[in-house]
Amino acid sequence: MGSTSINNSADLIAYSVSDGGSDWRTWKVMNIDSGEILSDEISWAKFSGATWENDDSGFFYQKYDEPNEELLKDINESPKLMFHKIGTDQSEDIVFYENSEKPRWGWSINVIKDTDIKLLSISEGTDERNRLYIQLNKGEKFIPLIDEFCLLYTSDAADDDAC
């Protein structure tokens, strides 16, 4: 098993599995109370967690295009930040964010509790330094908060009820 992520209602868990120790992950979803594995299955995720939307309708994840067998071990470029709605097929997932002009950049997202605010962390390759962008309302463009790779910035304090 790779990563896990429990939704806000604590009734569903998204978990990733890998095949043979590969970095490629397949995400699955399980009902915590019943133990039922739902039909949701997300393939070709890599270097990604699952971040639930506040309303538990689904989660965000990073994926790459499916490589052909010859390119399976090559450098992966041009990831997409996707949104998967629970109960739908992966082919219906929505591209939430991408930047084809920066093929080595990768994405992770933090959904701020009880708001529409989303923080996008952008990294390049395996470098831990990142950029932070913010989306204040659904459908709006992301605004750069920190637009250079100089330090590792996190958004942990944004979810702290003490703030």
Label for each model-derived stretch:
Residues 153-163:
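Single conserved hydrophobic/aromatic residue that forms the stacking wall/gate
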Residues 1-155:
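Beta-propeller folds
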